[in-house]
Amino acid sequence: MAWSTPSARTTGDLITAAIWNQDVVDNSQFLHDRVRELWIPWVTYYGSGLSEGNVGDWRSVAVVNNSINHIVWFSFCVPSDFASLAGLHLLVAASTSTTYEYDVNTDYGASGETYNVHSGQAVNQTVALTANQYALLDLSGLVGSLSAGDFVGLNLSNSNGANAGTLHVLGLRLRYNRT
């Protein structure tokens, strides 16, 4: 069937236009709801016995789990399109099955604020790890006041407990809803 007003069109053209208007143009308002992810590798580490290592093809910090003086640091800036936090997770893998005991500290703030205007701390945390399997440690509760443009410093350290094997620290995954 051909249409002649306002210009000549075929039924296929009208159906395509209707689908475009309904499913693409009208739904563009929801694009801001998409969750974005940012991968943050470790920056540096401190402690005797710590070294750079590998887990498969991943570069890692190999943390010998029997010393409380082992620290791995992360630093990053929160993206400008950040609207709200969907999750902050540390990706690790253990060389042996163990219960890992750890502490996490964080300080963050924006330009013009003190470096520790927002702080978070979790001490004597534990997580059961299975040998050679990825594990995500949820750190979301430590950055509850996170905002676009904030500069974040975060460190992971062994707590007082005895841990077996080696923990490979791979990186942080920041998940957020964008503006």
Annotate each language-model stretch with its function.
Residues 1-36, 50-57, 73-77, 101, ...:
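Extracellular "spike/adhesin" assembly and maturation modules
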Residues 38-49:
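N-terminal targeting leaders for non-cytosolic proteins
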Residues 64-85:
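Short beta-strands within extracellular/lumenal beta-sheet-rich domains
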Residues 81-84, 96-98, 162-166:
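A short beta-turn/strand-edge loop motif at beta-sheet boundaries
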Residues 83-94, 172:
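A short beta-strand element within beta-rich, extracytoplasmic domains
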Residues 91-93, 105-109, 175-177:
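Predominantly extracellular/luminal cell-surface or secreted proteins
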Residues 97-139:
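Terminal beta-strand-rich extracellular "head" domains
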Residues 155-163:
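Short beta-strand-plus-loop segments that form exposed binding edges in beta-rich domains
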